[in-house]
A protein has these predicted regions:
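A short, glycine/Asx- and small/polar-enriched loop/turn
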Residues: 154-156
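Amphipathic alpha-helical segments
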Residues: 23-147, 164
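Bacterial N-terminal signal peptides that target proteins for export
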Residues: 1-8
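Bacterial N-terminal signal peptides
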Residues: 8-16
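Sec/Tat signal peptide C-region and signal peptidase I cleavage site
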Residues: 18-22
């Protein structure tokens, strides 16, 4: 009986010590904030926003042109012969189909570009973070998105932002 209590006490003591020791080496980082607040990240966001706005303007212009053509064709419905109207309607339908394909293509290309830019950003900051954790003897860096609640003492986001801006 006495030895069981002793073993349980030792286990509790060891577990508490190991948890306390490991908690000191676990920190978290808000990657989104690093992207939004560093000069390199701001440049990436600015370029992506510019590309997105340009794409949206082109799509809107093409959509408006197609709507005008459709309205014009509707107004000419009674003037044109039935056969001529069908030919123009089919042509307009093909233009709408091409527009939809173009719209999908632009969206896919933008998503690819965005992913490439974000991957490049991660490749850029990864060695910086690795150097930081080596210097600070940190064992694990978690993404803030994956943490339910934690003390702000373990947040290294601001420090990483400063270091990335110095290296960027």
């Amino acid at each position: 009986m006495f030895s069981i209590k002793k073993i349980v006490f030792c286990l509790i003591l060891i577990l508490n010590f190991s948890v306390a020791q490991s908690a000191e080496k676990i920190v978290y980082l808000d990657i989104d904030q690093v992207l939004n607040k560093t000069n390199v990240g701001k440049k990436i966001i600015k370029n992506l926003d510019s590309l997105r706005k340009n794409n949206l303007q082109n799509i809107k212009k093409q959509r408006d042109d197609l709507k005008k053509k459709r309205d014009k064709l509707q107004k000419q419905k009674n003037i044109l012969s039935e056969e001529e109207f069908k030919v123009q309607a089919i042509s307009l339908e093909n233009e709408f189909r091409q527009f939809n394909e173009y719209n999908k293509k632009v969206s896919i290309e933008f998503d690819k570009k965005k992913q490439i830019e974000l991957d490049e950003f991660m490749k850029f900051i990864q060695p910086i973070i690795e150097k930081y954790i080596k210097e600070k003897s940190i064992t694990i860096v978690l993404n803030k998105k994956n943490i339910f609640i934690a003390s702000k003492d373990y947040d290294i986001t601001d420090e990483i932002i400063i270091i990335v801006d110095k290296n960027g």
